[in-house]
């Protein structure tokens, strides 16, 4: 019987919290705590439905600095950046200096055909009868 009363009381407390949550506005009251927030920290710790506050946990640093996010030197070491840079420079130089192959000739032919289909210069404005195929 006692467990039934406890479960009913817990359900009533949850319902009251839900009503408080639904009725509160988006802006907190000007002073003090919100009426929807429990005043007792022990009650807040016991409720498993409430989210864990990061700012109040032991995981939060006392004072945040850039070093927490980017690391102490705030730059990548040269021995990590240099190989990637040299590889990209070598690729660009190779693409520029290599001899043309059959694939390059085919690609140039395909691209030039597309250029020939598009007229150069501004498109001519068509009059309304010519636009619809009427003879003038």
UniProtKB/Swiss-Prot annotation:
Q: Which residues form the signal peptide?
A: 1-15
List residues in topological domain: Mitochondrial intermembrane.
98-136
Instruction: Give the start-end ranges of region Disordered.
Output: 26-58, 112-136
- Please give, as recorded in its UniProt entry, the membrane topology of this protein: Single-pass membrane protein
Q: Where are the transmembrane segments?
A: 81-97
Q: Where is the composition biased (Acidic residues)?
A: 112-127
Q: How does it assemble?
A: Forms a complex, named COMB/coordinator of mitochondrial CYTB biogenesis, composed of UQCC1, UQCC2, UQCC4, UQCC5 and UQCC6; stabilizes nascent cytochrome b/MT-CYB and promotes its membrane insertion. Forms a complex, named COMA, composed of UQCC1, UQCC2 and UQCC4; activates MT-CYB translation. Forms a complex, named COMC, composed of UQCC1, UQCC2; UQCC3 and UQCC4; mediates MT-CYB hemylation and association with the first nuclear-encoded complex III subunit UQCRQ. Complexes COMA and COMB are bound to the mitochondrion inner membrane by UQCC4.
Name the UniProt record assigns to this protein:
Ubiquinol-cytochrome c reductase complex assembly factor 4
Which organism encodes this protein? Mus musculus
């Amino acid at each position: 019987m006692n467990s039934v009363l406890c479960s009913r009381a817990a359900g009533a407390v949850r319902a009251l919290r839900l009503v408080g949550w639904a009725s509160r506005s988006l802006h907190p009251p000007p002073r003090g705590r919100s009426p929807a927030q429990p005043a007792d920290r022990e009650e807040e710790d016991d409720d498993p439905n409430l989210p864990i506050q990061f700012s109040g946990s032991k995981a939060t640093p006392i004072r945040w600095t850039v070093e927490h996010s980017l690391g102490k030197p705030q730059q990548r070491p040269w021995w990590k950046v240099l190989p990637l840079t040299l590889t990209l420079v070598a690729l660009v130089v190779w693409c520029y200096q290599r001899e043309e192959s059959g694939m390059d000739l085919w690609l140039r032919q395909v691209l030039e055909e597309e250029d020939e289909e598009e007229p150069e210069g501004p498109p001519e404005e068509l009059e309304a009868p010519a636009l619809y195929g009427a003879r003038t």
